[in-house]
Amino acid sequence: MATRLCCQLDPSRDVLCLRPVGAESRGRPLSGPLGTLSSPSPSAVPADHGAHLSLRGLPVCAFSSAGPCALRFTSARCMETTVNAHQILPKVLHKRTLGLPAMSTTDLEAYFKDCVFKDWEELGEEIRLKVFVLGGCRHKLVCAPAPCNFFTSA
């Protein structure tokens, strides 16, 4: 099972952040199935940090104490992406980009929790959960997600 992450929307930067649950922002080590991972400072993420997490499709910034870069998610079970998510998420993101009223922070966090983290945390399907970068992430080429076979059980 992957380290538990908290989904938070940062309205000041207008990005969705995943923060390790219980970890302090100053880089407290995280205990996970792969041993102890230290959270780097928000200012710099070493190029090799988290490279072993590439099998999960997570970019190396995923375990930063500042949270990863803006992300979009694809769940093999829900087939939810920013393109086909019932037209809800694309419209919300577009409105937020334009500075228009959109889905509340609470509703957006609940959306990601319901669509993504339920499968990941409760059903243990982290292998079939793919995380793709929306844009502007300098780490996206370090851990490119592997192709997903939707018919292979986790």
Swiss-Prot record:
Keyword tags: Activation of host NF-kappa-B by virus, Activator, Apoptosis, Host cytoplasm, Host G2/M cell cycle arrest by virus, Host mitochondrion, Host nucleus, Host-virus interaction, Modulation of host cell cycle by virus, Transcription, Transcription regulation
A Gene Ontology term for the protein's cellular component: host cell nucleus
One example of a Gene Ontology biological process annotation: symbiont-mediated activation of host NF-kappaB cascade
UniProt PTM: A fraction may be phosphorylated in insect cells and HepG2 cells, a human hepatoblastoma cell line. Phosphorylated in vitro by host protein kinase C or mitogen-activated protein kinase. N-acetylated in insect cells.
Subcellular location: Host cytoplasm; Host nucleus; Host mitochondrion
Primary location: host cell
Region (Mitochondrial targeting sequence): 68-117
Pfam family, one: X
Record carries keyword Protein biosynthesis: no
Family note: Belongs to the orthohepadnavirus protein X family.
Main function: Multifunctional protein that plays a role in silencing host antiviral defenses and promoting viral transcription. Does not seem to be essential for HBV infection. May be directly involved in development of cirrhosis and liver cancer (hepatocellular carcinoma). Most of cytosolic activities involve modulation of cytosolic calcium. The effect on apoptosis is controversial depending on the cell types in which the studies have been conducted. May induce apoptosis by localizing in mitochondria and causing loss of mitochondrial membrane potential.
Subunit structure: May form homodimer. May interact with host CEBPA, CFLAR, CREB1, DDB1, E4F1, HBXIP, HSPD1/HSP60, NFKBIA, POLR2E and SMAD4. Interacts with host SMC5-SMC6 complex and induces its degradation. Interacts with host TRPC4AP; leading to prevent ubiquitination of TRPC4AP. Interacts with host PLSCR1; this interaction promotes ubiquitination and degradation of HBx and impairs HBx-mediated cell proliferation.
Name used for this protein in its record: Protein X
Native source species: Hepatitis B virus genotype A2 subtype adw2 (isolate Germany/991/1990) (HBV-A)
